[in-house]
């Protein structure tokens, strides 16, 4: 019975996935995933990305955000990306594979960044979901806290932070922590974010060095 339920659920997910207009549009335009449209909507509204910027992309695989970032910052910009999963190489993207939670990986990432010269830190990280809501929420909040800590180590004064956060326990405190570090903080729910998902994007600007 369980296998039948899982099979039916999987079939529904696959149908929804391939019927999804954002999936179809991503395939048509050569983007690696539909997630690019979430970032594009944030960029359309907040205009944070410009040529020659240095940006850090956390949770980068399969790479649609890095693709988009490389286009926006251009040849004179720099995209430094990290993910625990492998990612096929992209022109203009310096990719580091490893677990961002491990000290050695964090140190290697900081070495590539080389000082407080980052204009924007972006995080689309999410933990492997276990199905236990409280465990999954704690894991996701830990990742966003690490991303905020990365901002404190590498962001320029007045730099920006775009981070995916799941609403739930710990969200309000994290939002306050971000407000303590940035002058302006907005919450975005892009159209490309599935309605049933608890994910939102915190968009913070004006980093207080």
From Swiss-Prot:
Pfam families: FtsJ. InterPro entries: RNA_methyltr_RlmE, RNA_MeTrfase_FtsJ_dom, rRNA-MeTfrase_E, SAM-dependent_MTases_sf. One of its GO terms (molecular function) is rRNA (uridine-2'-O-)-methyltransferase activity. It is an enzyme of class 2 (transferase). It is found in: Cytoplasm. Keywords: Cytoplasm, Methyltransferase, rRNA processing, S-adenosyl-L-methionine, Transferase. The keyword Transferase applies. The active site is at residue 164. Its EC number is 2.1.1.166. S-adenosyl-L-methionine binds at residues 63, 65, 83, 99, 124. The keyword rRNA processing applies. It comes from the Bacteria. It catalyses: uridine(2552) in 23S rRNA + S-adenosyl-L-methionine = 2'-O-methyluridine(2552) in 23S rRNA + S-adenosyl-L-homocysteine + H(+). GO terms for cellular component: cytoplasm. Specifically methylates the uridine in position 2552 of 23S rRNA at the 2'-O position of the ribose in the fully assembled 50S ribosomal subunit. Belongs to the class I-like SAM-binding methyltransferase superfamily. RNA methyltransferase RlmE family. HAMAP family: RNA_methyltr_E. This is Ribosomal RNA large subunit methyltransferase E. It comes from Pseudoalteromonas translucida (strain TAC 125). The lineage of its organism: Bacteria, Pseudomonadati, Pseudomonadota, Gammaproteobacteria, Alteromonadales.
């Amino acid at each position: 019975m369980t296998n039948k339920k899982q099979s039916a659920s999987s079939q529904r997910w696959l149908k929804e996935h391939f019927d999804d207009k954002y999936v179809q549009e991503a395939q048509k335009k050569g983007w690696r995933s539909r997630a690019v449209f979430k970032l594009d909507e944030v960029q359309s509204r907040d205009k944070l990305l410009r040529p020659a910027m240095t940006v850090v992309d956390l949770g980068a695989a399969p790479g649609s955000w890095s693709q988009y970032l490389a286009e926006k910052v251009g040849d004179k910009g720099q995209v430094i990306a990290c993910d625990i999963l492998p990612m096929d190489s992209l022109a203009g993207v310096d990719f580091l594979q490893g677990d961002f939670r491990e000290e050695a990986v964090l140190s290697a990432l900081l070495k590539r960044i080389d000082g407080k010269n980052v204009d924007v830190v972006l995080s689309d990280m999410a933990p492997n979901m276990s199905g236990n809501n409280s465990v999954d929420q704690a894991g996701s909040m830990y990742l966003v806290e690490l991303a905020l800590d990365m901002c404190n180590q590498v962001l320029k004064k007045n730099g920006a932070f775009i981070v995916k956060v799941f609403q739930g326990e710990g969200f309000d405190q994290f939002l306050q922590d971000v407000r303590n570090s940035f002058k302006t903080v907005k919450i975005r729910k892009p159209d490309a974010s599935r309605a049933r998902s608890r994910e939102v994007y915190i968009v913070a600007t004006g980093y207080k060095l």
